[in-house]
Amino acid sequence: MSETYYEAINWNEIEDIIDKSTWEKLTEQFWLDTRIPLSNDLDDWRTLSQLEKDTVDFKSNYDENRKEPVVFPTRTPNLLINGSSGIAVGMATNMAPHNLSEAVDAIVAYIDNRDLEIADLMKYIKAPDFPTGGIIYGYSGVKDAFETGRGRVVVRSKVEIETDAQGREKIVINEIPYMVNKVELIKSVVALVEEKKVEGIAHINDESDREGMRIVIDIKRDANSNVVLNKLFKMTALQSSFSVNNIALVNGRPRMLNLKDLIHYFVEHRHEVVIRRTQFELAEAEKRAHLLEGFMIILDNLDEAIQIIRDSKNPEEARTRLMERFGLSEI
């Protein structure tokens, strides 16, 4: 008996980075070998169970040794809430994540009224919802992204200026922009201090724990904490931008999508999935009803049916005679 062992990986992109391709290959192989998805999301389990109900089309994988779904029959707008990032020949996509509750509210509103404009949908989805937090600095980039599918969203770290018992000020960082690595951020601040490009910093310490992030920058007594902070915003990733480029495949072709487009195509996808699932379940129910009707006919004429089977030379002859005698048909 051969066994495959899978190494557990704890991945936190804020702390450090691993090769995403390795992780994806590992999870894909684990799924193919065990049929157990590496997720606790209930929607994932329901999604996988619906694959067997002809809800989506299948295609051959890269070496044509098995079939894989073209898309998943998901019940959640994953592209909108999770975002996406990728590069292809001559194009790239970079989609921001959004809040699930806001996205659901916007989708429900759109289903109720297909004539809603982007401005109406923006009453439900206010802005991207980055998992690492931060503060969106300015709204024009968000508005551009929602209206055109392309925009530059500026995100600042969430900071507080505290004063200790000795009267010394501290810059406390509680949240950092999306896709910024905490370790690299601290290294960049240290480098600026060593190169004397930023003055007034006495010490920097990472006090983060399971309760949350806390990077503490001690300010010298003769320095102004606001001046230091503004320099850090300008010279480090404490302030960074997320360039939105909403390119996604629509019917196999790349398209630039605004907010309404993203919601529209998700609703259309769900509509198709529900119809195909219902058609599959109806066909299965009709097959079952057909069998039960046949069983009822045979049970009502059980002795004669048994005699026909005994008198037949082989199963094929028995099947033919039963069908002719009782008006049965194949599925």
Language model regions located:
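Conserved phosphate/anionic-ligand binding catalytic regions in large, soluble enzymes, centered on
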Residues: K20, Q29, T74-S101, G327-I331
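Conserved glycine-bearing catalytic or ligand-binding loops at nucleotide- and phosphate-handling centers
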Residues: N40-D43, M91-V153, V183
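A short, flexible low-complexity segment enriched in Lys/Arg and Gly/Pro that occurs
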Residues: T55-R75, A109, Y137, E304-A305
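Short, hydrophobic/aliphatic alpha-helical segments
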Residues: N65-S85, S312-E317
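Long, charged, helix-rich clamp/arm modules that form nucleic acid-engaging surfaces
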Residues: M1-L42, D129, A165, P177-Y178, ...
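Extended active-site and interfacial segments that coordinate phosphate-rich ligands
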Residues: N94-R114, N174, Y178-N181, I186-K196, ...
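Short beta-strand elements
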Residues: P77-L80, V153-T163
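A short, contiguous, amphipathic alpha-helix enriched in charged residues
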Residues: N40-K67, N174-E199
